[in-house]
Amino acid sequence: VMMPCVPPWKSEWVPRGNAPSGYRSHIALCKAADETYLVGWVDYEPGYAPNVQAELEANRDNFVNGMQAQLLTTTNTTWQGFPALEFTARRGDTHDITSRVVMKATRPYQLAVLTPAGQHRSANIDRFMASQRLK
């Protein structure tokens, strides 16, 4: 993924309730001027068999809720042959959010861009989103 800066990476183990199982999340945030770029993915424990559509929707919903945003659009699609969900959201009256979640095997990958609300930034968003490569 091409980002306008070299972001620090954060990885953390997230347990599932009181169970010993869980997942490891990996996130990088890049702030460039008044735009924020996010790349993330999750590694689940061995043997986890997700319902792909439910996983895509849960990633979207958790992200939108975590950002305290309102979902505006959502589209089921594919990215490089893998199931994907693209969506937009609005965070209050300050930020527009454009995001894609792609499911490759048991690993969901997410890209997101936050831009000032109502400003036309499609060139930056499109360049970032198009740079995603899944091996």
Specify the residue positions occupied by each region the protein language model found.
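Acidic-enriched, low-complexity/disordered segments with a strong bias for Aspartate over Glutamate
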Residues: 34, 43, 55, 61, ...
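Signature of long, low-cysteine stretches enriched in small and polar/charged residues
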Residues: 6-29, 59-104
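Solvent-exposed coil/turn segments that connect beta secondary-structure elements
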Residues: 42-44, 92, 106, 116-117
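A short acidic-to-branched-hydrophobic micro-motif
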Residues: 25-55, 101, 109-113
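Surface-exposed amphipathic alpha-helical segments
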Residues: 1-11, 55-71, 106-135
